[in-house]
Amino acid sequence: CSYDEKFNEILGNKIENVFDVWGGCSGIQSGFQVTFNEGCVKRNVCPTVLANAMSVQPAKAFGIYGRKGDIKPGFDADLLIVDPEKEWEITSDSLLYVNKISAFVGMKGKGLPIMTMIRGNVVAEDGKIVAEKGVGTFIKKIK
């Protein structure tokens, strides 16, 4: 169960909408920068290897390679631009999700996404979401 009435005391309010419920240990926001720092910065892993592990292979596993996961003609222009020298520290205040709890809080490193594009449209820049809600689209598995 991701929500219990006991959390009302922690949050200070009653959650009425299921989409306001948080649970687990969040990491999606920080996952890339932590992986880049641990792999590419600390262990000299080639960024191409990281792109393969975090984009190409997941797209293949989910059956959407051919539209997602690579930079090729016919694929969506989903891109993440990284400044490999930009330093960062993950704090509770820097987390954009409802729960301000993450195993990554307190970590510091180098290599920060500075721009994110979905289908060629800039959706995030310098850590700020710049797109309107609803720019994403459901992708069905390619047969």
Question: Which ranges hold each PLM region?
Answer:
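His/Asp/Glu-enriched, well-ordered alpha-helical/loop segment
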Residues: C1-K86
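Peripheral (often C-terminal) accessory segments that flank ATP-dependent C-N-forming ligase machineries
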Residues: I139-K143
